[in-house]
Amino acid sequence: MNIILFGPPGAGKGTQAQHIVKNYKYFQISTGDLLRNEIKKKTTLGEDIEKIISKGEFVSDSVVNILLKNAIKNLKFKDKIIFDGYPRNLLQVENLKKNLIEFKQNIGAIIFLNVTSDIIEKRIMGRVTCERCNMTLNKYLNPKEIESHPCGRGFLKKRKDDGSEIAIYRYDTYMEKTKPVLDFYSNGPDFHEIDGSLEIQVIKGKIEQILKV
């Protein structure tokens, strides 16, 4: 089954997605990664995306849908996709539904990691990403993991959109824009809400129970 993994920026979606990928042989589709990859290509579209993200704003639905559809149509992902942080609004819900129907796929679980803004701010301020392996680490939540990172500390970089003010703005914007989506999915039997402030291993255990049902 495919999975939708929800939560505000800094909720730990990436960490949990990595766990599912490693242990359940899933493929993670993160709109953030798709956007950053487009930026790295230095295309005109990538330059426009970079300007928007640096302000803490969200990229348009039409652009996101183009990038996401290109990823979904890869047949090796069929019924093994984690949609990390997507969809964010009702239009994206409809776009996702159309894309899944077109490529004969569906959603089996919707998981929402619910976290407060003060915890989000601390998590985001301590977050770094490895430029070599793309792993996300946090110097506040798990400093030992940074010291022992196999790629070395020299590859750990802070993202441009991880400032304190931008972090809070992104949290508030996310919760405002995503609420209709959460309301839409929360009425279904496949919706699961998890306290995102719990220890990482506890959250992993709760997600594993969902996947085993």
Predicted regions and their residues:
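Glycine-rich phosphate-binding loop of ATP-dependent small-molecule kinases
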Residues: 1-213
